[in-house]
Regions:
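Short linear sequence motif anchored by a di-proline
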Residues: 1-199
Length: 199
């Protein structure tokens, strides 16, 4: 499961590229300082875009914690997308999670080696992307989780699940709770991702 992402894209580029959706983008808490981060892990804050919660037309970009405590105390940082619709309730809904890379780990070939191999996945044709997420109000404040689906051919050699990465054409559709999640939560086609070994 995905528990580490990269976000080095500048806020200005996010704002400019999001204009493609023709959805006004607001910053109700002020423009966040999106310092480039090579590693964002569970419980770290990251930028999300969600339908406006202040009554303004459009969407808003805020930073929120990744994961919330589950009933067993373990962090809910990924959630399976299959069989669910993920509409909006008064305490949460769909969001886009901003990143330009994510990491997966594989076991070393040598069974005596303790350190796993680390792989960085990036989009071949885009500088950054949005992952399908859910946000909600929790005991630790507002937080988000990432949705997962079956792996596409680029990820299958490394993991048996993949995060849901949305095409730019689907950003606005994901923020619309009337669009069925199953229409959007699909594996990526072959050749969408580049992969590089980090260690």
């Amino acid at each position: 499961m995905c528990n580490e992402v990269r976000r080095t894209v500048a806020l200005g580029q996010v704002r400019d590229d999001f204009s493609f959706t023709r959805i006004p983008l607001h910053f109700p808490e002020g423009a966040p300082n999106l310092a480039p981060l090579e590693s964002i892990r569970i419980t770290d804050p990251n930028a999300i875009i969600r339908p406006s919660t202040t009554g303004e037309q459009g969407a808003e970009l805020v930073t929120r914690r990744w994961s919330w405590p589950g009933p067993n105390g373990k962090p809910v940082f990924n959630m399976r997308s299959e069989g669910r619709d993920f509409g909006f309730s008064g305490t949460g809904g769909r969001c886009l999670v901003v990143a330009d890379g994510f990491y997966e780990y594989t076991a070393p070939e040598d069974p005596k080696a303790k350190r796993k191999h680390k792989w960085l996945f990036t989009m071949r044709s885009e500088d950054w992307f949005c992952m399908a997420g859910l946000w909600r109000k929790t005991d630790v404040g507002e937080a988000f989780t990432l949705l997962t689906t079956a792996p596409g051919p680029d990820i299958e050699p490394y993991h048996n699940r993949q995060i849901v990465i949305l095409s730019r054409d689907d950003w606005a559709r994901w923020l619309d709770p009337g669009v069925p999640a199953a229409d959007l939560a699909k594996p990526l086609p072959a050749g969408t991702l580049d992969v590089a070994q980090i260690c």
